[in-house]
A protein has these predicted regions:
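Rossmann-like AdoMet
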Residues: 1-89, 93-137, 142-143, 147-153
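Short SAM/SAH-binding signature in class I
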Residues: 153-159
Length: 159
């Protein structure tokens, strides 16, 4: 398998590998709180020295609990059907695979927002989907919010 070499230069952006590794480790546990096959696949696809993070067992459990909680919130948001246009926006998405984990994902539009170098890597790793879109930018800018409002004038948003 040809591995993908990340071109992440920013130290903050590089932290995206920690929760990815946590999700992959958790998924391999027999009594896993969160199963994330996509995380396992991504760790195998990326040419990166994950060993530099050492043992991350303490943060693995916390990450799994937090992600399972947010996955359930997203699932309920979509299931409530309070709008014909539910929109889920993941700010600072990194390499999170919530779209793949949430079973009713095709009933909503997902947007993954992160720094350009992170989104560039994400677009190489994740399968393209008309329901899981990316936004290159900073959460501190507001132009992406205006774009979402234009695209989804009757949308109900979950950030």
């Amino acid at each position: 398998m040809n591995k993908i070499k990340p071109e992440i230069k920013d130290n903050i952006a590089e932290t995206l590998f920690i929760p990815l590794l946590s999700r992959a480790h958790e998924s391999h546990r027999k009594d896993a709180i969160l199963k994330d096959p996509m995380a396992c696949e991504l760790v195998e696809k990326i040419d990166y020295d994950f060993a530099k993070f050492g043992k991350i067992t303490m943060s693995t459990t916390g990450t799994a609990i937090r992600l399972r909680h947010f996955d359930r919130l997203v699932q309920r948001f979509i299931d409530r059907k309070v709008t014909e246009d539910p929109v889920v926006v993941s700010i600072g998405c990194g390499l999170d695979s919530r779209f793949q984990r949430v079973s009713n994902h095709n009933q909503a539009t997902f947007y993954e927002l992160d720094l350009p170098e992170v989104i560039n890597l994400r677009e190489k790793l994740f399968p393209a989907s008309a329901k899981d879109l990316t936004i290159k930018g900073s959460m501190l800018e507001t132009d992406w919010m205006d774009m979402l409002r234009q695209k989804h004038p009757h949308g109900r948003f979950l950030f």
